Amino acid sequence: MRLDDEPENALVVSSSPKTVVASGNVKYKGVVQQQNGHWGAQIYADHKRIWLGTFKSADEAATAYDSASIKLRSFDANSHRNFPWSTITLNEPDFQNCYTTETVLNMIRDGSYQHKFRDFLRIRSQIVASINIGGPKQARGEVNQESDKCFSCTQLFQKELTPSDVGKLNRLVIPKKYAVKYMPFISADQSEKEEGEIVGSVEDVEVVFYDRAMRQWKFRYCYWKSSQSFVFTRGWNSFVKEKNLKEKDVIAFYTCDVPNNVKTLEGQRKNFLMIDVHCFSDNGSVVAEEVSMTVHDSSVQVKKTENLVSSMLEDKETKSEENKGGFMLFGVRIECP
């Protein structure tokens, strides 16, 4: 909980971050003990010190530092954490992708970060539990009879991955008939450099998809004149690695319409695109999801996860923090060994 602002110079030039030793000989980066007994949090980025606020405990200040480091030091966030990643904090990068760096820092300073992160997790788990995957013949906008809070995702097309799709070229070729019909319009009258880097008057777009876990994926979509193909480039390699994609796996693309009575994530439209993976099995078949399968009906685990998140993220700020053997992290009591 943030108590007050730094009196002066919230952003000043300095050389190296400070480390504080809290109770139990635990060292926290970016935490400064103050004369009034409270704890300040700060982080260094581009050789500048950014003030994050004042907190009641060193643990809260250290947590604020970890959250800020995700946005400011995403390239090596693992090297700058006070606490190990958990099943809860692993969702922070996705949450922060919805906001600018300035907005994330302001939320940390004004004390609203943890509340908005909690809301993000709850809304996302509710969306996952409401998705109804439909086949290509399902009518777009069809009303689900089981619940008006479910929304259907209609398949646009699918593609079996080739060796080059998951190889060193770091690109996915979209078949022309699907690219023209379903993807945003881009001009095919372009010149390009080697390795697909386009120069001159270029038209390429960033397309945004969500997977089944409602994690956002952004791909650069453009036209390669040399091979006369429509491709996903930037962002595709990360998706391949994260999903451990192999040759003959199938990628399916969907369009999803969200009813007005269902909340969406920050910045997410009521109509969005979804990307799903059907893995190729050892027996030579593709393990696909059943048509019209509702996720929350087929997966009790999703509901359990939603209940767990709600339980773990209950607001306990008014409760005592007298337990000397632990600390509070996003409303959860973490016991120290």
Curated annotation (Swiss-Prot):
It is found in: Nucleus. It comes from the Eukaryota. GO terms for cellular component: nucleus. Its main location: nucleus. Residues 27-84, 157-271 bind DNA. SMART domains: AP2, B3. Keywords: Activator, DNA-binding, Ethylene signaling pathway, Nucleus, Transcription, Transcription regulation. One of its GO terms (molecular function) is DNA binding. One of its GO terms (biological process) is ethylene-activated signaling pathway. Probably acts as a transcriptional activator. Binds to the GCC-box pathogenesis-related promoter element. May be involved in the regulation of gene expression by stress factors and by components of stress signal transduction pathways. Belongs to the AP2/ERF transcription factor family. RAV subfamily. This is AP2/ERF and B3 domain-containing transcription factor At1g50680.
